[in-house]
């Protein structure tokens, strides 16, 4: 005798959701390369109840895929909520916390390294939700060029998120962007959302100006990228008001 679990009134296309949450407050420090966001993140993380800075590459990837229409809105919003909660959950017991001494995001660069060293030996897992409730920590995330594609963040986290955009004189950012193009574009260490253009692999931000991107040198690419990012950022600000 055989039967099917799929009945006549099943969901044909599921909506991805996450309604509950652990992180009550999230602060995101964002900006273009060379703007000084890591320095500001370190200062902000020294404030009361704010956790040490952590990079949020997963959230960046989700938002970029959504921007490229490669991920549906419900999935993008749910994943932003999942990643913020998961990061705080792990951090509250120093799981996946960076102990590499020289890194900018290292425990040893934090205002209170001992807090994270103690967590290694404390009880974890089941007690973490209650610890979060009692201590009310603020998750501190540092991101790269996120504001320009940040709709899933604002819609997913709503009034739980504080978004800080770091802006610097464009000359210094241009220098850093140019260096990135000279050193990182063909480097397999640069884990990025890329798009296919003919036989070429281009960064996601070259979308809709691929031919121009290919024809430019490193300095020109940096200028066009900065301009395009600023335009997208301003558009997002207007739409999210």
Regions found by a protein language model. Name each.
Residues 6, 49-54, 66:
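Extracellular glycan-modifying ectodomains
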Residues 1-13:
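N-terminal pre-Walker A segment at the start of P-loop NTPase domains
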Residues 35-51:
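A conserved segment at the C-terminal end of the G1
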Residues 129, 133-134, 138, 144-241:
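PAPS-dependent sulfotransferase catalytic domain
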């Amino acid at each position: 005798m055989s039967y099917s679990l799929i009945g006549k009134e099943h969901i044909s296309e599921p909506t991805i959701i996450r309604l509950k949450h652990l992180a009550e407050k999230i602060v995101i420090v964002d900006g273009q390369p060379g703007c000084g966001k890591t320095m500001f993140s370190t200062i902000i993380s020294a404030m009361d109840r704010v956790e040490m800075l952590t990079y949020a590459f997963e959230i960046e990837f989700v938002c970029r895929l959504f921007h490229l229409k490669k991920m549906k809105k419900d999935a993008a919003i749910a994943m932003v909520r999942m990643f913020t909660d998961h990061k705080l959950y792990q951090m509250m017991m120093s799981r996946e916390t960076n102990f590499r001494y020289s890194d900018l995001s290292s425990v040893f660069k934090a205002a209170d390294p001992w807090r994270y060293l103690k967590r290694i030996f404390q009880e974890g897992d089941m007690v973490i939700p209650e610890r979060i409730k009692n201590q009310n920590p603020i998750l501190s995330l540092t991101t790269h060029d996120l504001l320009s594609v940040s709709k899933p963040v604002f819609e997913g986290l709503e009034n739980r998120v504080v978004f800080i955009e770091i802006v610097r004189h464009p000359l210094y950012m241009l220098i850093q962007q140019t260096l990135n193009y000279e050193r990182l574009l063909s480097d397999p260490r640069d884990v990025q959302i890329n798009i296919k253009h003919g036989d070429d692999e281009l960064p996601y931000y070259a979308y809709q100006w691929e031919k121009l991107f290919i024809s430019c040198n490193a300095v020109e690419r940096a200028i066009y990228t900065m301009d395009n990012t600023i335009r997208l950022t301003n558009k997002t600000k207007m739409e999210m008001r």
